[in-house]
Design a protein with these regions (language model features):
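C-terminal accessory domains/tails appended to large, multi-domain proteins
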Residues: 4-7, 11-192
Length: 192
């Protein structure tokens, strides 16, 4: 019985992770090209008898945000991410609008994964020698060229799927593996 509860809990967590990743990707698609880069402060270490350990930096003011063409910007105090100090998976966020007061603030922000940016962002260009993919000339992600090829193929398949759904509203988009593949990529951020 206890094992069944544990498995049910694991299933709920996995389902929630899939839903959360999918919703964030949809938000990314809807708000793109409003993308900001998150720059964390340098990591600090504390010397201990067993070696150096990373210390947690709890000061949100040390986290910096940048928007191409505007330089440094700030998260609006009403945002849920205003006091955030941990950005585990992605140094990118999307925002709905900018507001200029004493500072330039971003409103309604949402963290997005690199995979969401690759799938739903702008034009991709590959820099083979640097092993990077650049989105719209200003969002640089470290990845081999083969990732760009696969992402382009996924984008093409998704566009075909969406075009068919528009042409045939009764078409079941869940019938194929394209959507499942995209959701798995978003959930794992391409790690699988």
């Amino acid at each position: 019985m206890e094992e069944r509860k544990h498995l049910r809990g694991a299933h709920v967590r996995t389902t929630w992770a899939r839903v959360r990743a999918t919703v964030r990707a949809i938000v990314c698609a809807g708000l793109y090209p409003n993308v900001a880069e998150v720059r964390l402060p340098d990591t600090k270490y504390l010397a201990t008898a067993r070696g150096a350990i990373e210390t947690a930096n709890e000061e949100a003011r040390l986290v910096k945000y940048f928007v191409p063409g505007h330089g440094r910007v700030f998260i609006h105090p009403s945002s849920a991410l205003f006091s955030a100090t941990h950005f585990h998976k992605s140094p990118w966020l999307v925002y709905s609008s900018k507001q200029q007061t004493a500072k330039l603030y971003l409103r309604d922000v949402c963290l997005v994964s690199p995979m969401a940016l690759l799938l739903f962002g702008g034009e991709l260009s590959v820099q083979h020698e640097k092993q990077t993919i650049v989105i719209d000339g200003h969002i640089t992600l470290a990845a081999p060229a083969r990732v760009a090829v696969l992402v382009r193929e996924m984008r093409t398949e998704l566009q075909k799927l969406m075009a068919r759904k528009i042409a045939e509203p009764a078409f079941d988009m869940n019938a194929g593996s394209v959507l499942d593949g995209i959701i798995k990529l978003l959930t794992s951020d391409g790690a699988e």
